[in-house]
Curated annotation (Swiss-Prot):
Pfam families: Viral_helicase1. PROSITE patterns: PSRV_HELICASE. It comes from Potato virus X (strain HB) (PVX). InterPro entries: (+)RNA_virus_helicase_core_dom. Belongs to the Tymovirales TGBp1 protein family. Keywords: Host cytoplasm, Host-virus interaction, Inhibition of host innate immune response by virus, RNA-binding, Suppressor of RNA silencing, Transport, Viral immunoevasion, Viral movement protein. Residues 1-138 form the (+)RNA virus helicase ATP-binding domain. Transports viral genome to neighboring plant cells directly through plasmosdesmata, without any budding. The movement protein allows efficient cell to cell propagation, by bypassing the host cell wall barrier. Increases plasmodesma size exclusion limit. Acts as a suppressor of RNA-mediated gene silencing, also known as post-transcriptional gene silencing (PTGS), a mechanism of plant viral defense that limits the accumulation of viral RNAs. The keyword Transport applies. The keyword RNA-binding applies. One of its GO terms (biological process) is symbiont-mediated suppression of host innate immune response. TGBp1, TGBp2 and TGBp3 seem to act together for cell-to-cell propagation. TGBp1 is the main movement protein that physically cross the plasmodesma with the viral genome. TGBp2 and TGBp3 would facilitate TGBp1 function. This is Movement and silencing protein TGBp1.
Length: 226
């Protein structure tokens, strides 16, 4: 655990008052904070770590083990579970738990370490996220493009993400391909369009909206309300 704690401190994670001997080490970071990259570096440098994820696992590689789906843990290895908030039933076998608590706040634990800074989210999108009430900031140098209009007031570009059933019905009726926020956890896209039947004032503080808007690393379009 010492290696992991040293790594977290070097990456700018802040320590909470929760004692380290209180269950598994819990680490929270906002979307785009470099959590997965940091975990991959641990794997590359230290053979005693095993890292699983409930999100999207790494592609199979002949060079590295990568972050894998939950499975056997080699005896003596320090086991880490990423995206732990996606399922509360698979935590017991792990000594450390990582997640973005905003993606599933109802399943989040009190953290030992946290990081509120994203390195991926463009400045304009980050400002909108923060204005909606999330503790969120960015170190990205990209201003990005942000456009917020009614649901029928602009084109649907890039990866289209529907965040409510009415939007899904509307998109299906018009033959538009779309995904739900839960289908793109851990992924990122250069262009994202978020579609909702409700206005931004109603959806801004929702987990679904947060999950959707943090998938963008460039151009962000919000088509919400009438």
């Amino acid at each position: 655990m010492d290696i992991l704690i040293i790594s977290l401190k070097s990456l700018g994670y802040s320590r909470t008052s929760r004692p380290l001997d209180s269950g598994p080490l819990v680490v929270h970071a906002v979307a785009g904070a470099g959590k997965s990259t940091a975990l991959r570096k641990l794997l590359a440098r230290h053979s005693t770590f095993t890292i699983h994820t409930l999100g999207v696992p790494d592609k199979i590689s002949i060079r590295t083990r990568g972050i894998q789906k939950p499975g056997p843990i080699p005896k003596g290895n320090f086991a880490i579970l990423d995206e732990y908030t996606l399922d509360a039933t698979t935590r017991e076998a792990y000594q450390a738990l990582f997640a973005d608590p905003y993606q599933a706040p109802e399943l989040s634990l009190e953290p030992h370490f946290y990081l509120e800074t994203s390195f991926r989210t463009p400045k304009k999108a980050a400002a909108l996220i923060a204005s909606c009430g999330f503790d969120f900031e960015t170190n990205s140098q990209e201003e990005g493009h942000l456009e917020v209009t009614g649901i029928f007031k602009g084109p649907l570009l890039g990866k289209v993400i529907a965040i409510d059933s009415e939007a899904e019905t509307t998109l299906s009726r018009h033959g538009v391909e779309f995904v739900k926020p839960c289908q793109v956890t851990g992924l990122e896209f250069p262009v994202v369009t978020i579609v909702s039947a409700a206005p931004i004032e109603e959806i801004g503080q929702s987990t679904l909206f947060y999950n959707a808007i943090t998938r963008s690393k460039g151009l962000t379009y919000v088509r919400a309300g009438t």
